[in-house]
């Protein structure tokens, strides 16, 4: 009997063990679809980004007009540009759903996979932020000014650090050039981290909705989950194309249609929708350093989740009180997202502060205590 090439060839064997003959729990739901969707987003963003980079010019006198040139004169430039901009939104939508799934079903107990995932989140956030600066519109310029200025909150070395990042005494040509360089470079780091993420995941195998050991009931990834993932991919691409072709500027900021002007500040500086929750947490503390630390900790807190897990059960599937807290956390994040887009005035300041306190309270105090209570109820 002839041996199958995909099982013997050194390279094909790796692909086979990762995407074809991979033993997968038979009961994983649609929530396990987002990993492959994120992979698809990454590929799409890299391809569209590559074509945009061919026509973009990272000089402050040319950047804005080069983006205009792409959308007007390049063949299908408008499509590539809009797919890249809205693809970022879909990327973050998938990331947040993927992380939410991980929290709900206790996937964070695969510590290495989880930690690499958070590092991926930071890298993607940095990439998205720098990408937003590249069109050199008003919101690009002032967004970059506000966010890079946060580094000055660092004691002693703050101001030096800001000037080092800017490459001068203000945001200028050097800043735009380095942001373009890093925006081009980071996606390849993301690809590398993704491979490590998958490598650690395949050491343990996937978690499943029950949180129980599923070794007794595994099925091959292909054809079962490759087709299931294909459905998710079609739905995601449909959403992306609907956004791109019918509402291309729905998620953008109208201020970015105005070229960057250091002499005119927009009435309300705000980041893209996917950073609004963190921006609201940053603004909820009246102290600069305190705000920056809260902003950092709002993401870094994810590293603590495996340590804060006190339940005897892995998943929240059979824990109704924890479920209520989880959905309260989701609602809280939606409130923070809304507050981040509002001006700094009452009642928004107070709502933002309460929502920020609630965010940390649920994750650090309420969920661990609830898990202990649920353990006692099982006895």
From Swiss-Prot:
One function term, GO molecular function aspect: metal ion binding
Superkingdom as given in the UniProt entry: Eukaryota
Gene3D superfamilies according to UniProt: Cytochrome Bc1 Complex, Chain C
Chain sites annotated for binding heme b b566: 98, 197
Cofactor(s) this protein cannot do without: heme b
Binding-site residues, a ubiquinone: 202
Role, per record: Component of the ubiquinol-cytochrome c reductase complex (complex III or cytochrome b-c1 complex) that is part of the mitochondrial respiratory chain. The b-c1 complex mediates electron transfer from ubiquinol to cytochrome c. Contributes to the generation of a proton gradient across the mitochondrial membrane that is then used for ATP synthesis.
Protein name: Cytochrome b
Organism of this sequence: Carettochelys insculpta
